[in-house]
Amino acid sequence: VSSKVVSKALGLREASPASPEGARRHREQVVARATVRVVAERRTPRGTTRVVEAVAGPVMAAAGVDASNTGPDGGVLLLPEDPDAAAADLHARLVGLRPGTRVGVILTDTAGRAWRAGQVDLALGAHGLHVVDDLRGGTDVDGRPLAVTERALADELAAAADLVKGKLGGVAAALVRGLPEAVAPAGTTPGARSLVRTGPSDWFAVGHHEAVRAALGAPPGSVAAEEVGLAPVGPEPVEERGARAVRLAVLGHPGAGVTGSAGTGYAVHAPDPVTAGRVAARLEVALAGEDVGAAVHVAEHPGTGAPSQADRAPGSRPPLG
């Protein structure tokens, strides 16, 4: 069942202002409310796109807030805060209509995937079925033991159902037959939230740019991140990436400044040698995070008469990006 029709039934639609700018700001506010944490963010011609951990569970763009197929009055739709509970409620209603029926319910939503282009439907919520087919402990066709393989059965069913439902025909649900082994007694199996990697199992809890920026005081989704500036979704000239690294390096260090360019190298100026060295080190990290290989040195500190010994040559350390 499409989560969109469930969201409509639950009254999770919000009207948007008529003006494009007002609608954009309203959508950003709605996304923020539906967000647990920001994973990655990029600048686009239409504003800022954020990949977030949604209150609904998965990591997805814009917390799953959607402005398509919302009805003639427009607005945006939010995902149910507890999709597994919504699936359980729908399951109970279906069984109530047909007592004795063995059925599993999957709430589906469309999302992108790391490492892959395009979008697919996945299981947002589930009840009354095994969401995973755990093959660990078995053997492959050659008799070798399987130690890792767990089929995300609920996601596979969600994607298969989308081949029938499609995106443009207004079909909200599909009935999948022929998998009796996937169905389980109500309340005996984990829901779709169990498919979301969290904690130590989440190797990609934050984007690589965002990890560097967060370490230097500008975590994703923060005012500081906006002040430093966000990377765009497409290619960007090296000088713009370098300028953003400079803004990040001097963040929280009043009186410090940087001159130079990505092509000629950067000189750090500060009221005292300690601050200068600190900002220079921050700049090296920030430049690596932007994949800019440029020399960094501390300018001669007033009153010392001595040049800095903190020079770094271009390419002295591999880029992080």
Where are these regions (language model features)?
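A structural signal for small-residue-enriched, beta-sheet-centric alpha/beta enzyme cores
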Residues: 2-8, 21, 25-67, 71, ...
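Short, basic, glycine/proline-bearing loop/turn elements
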Residues: 70-79
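Short glycine/threonine-rich beta-strand-turn micro-motifs
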Residues: 263-277
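Short, non-transmembrane amphipathic alpha-helical segments
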Residues: 279-291
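Cysteine-centric segments in proteins
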Residues: 304-319
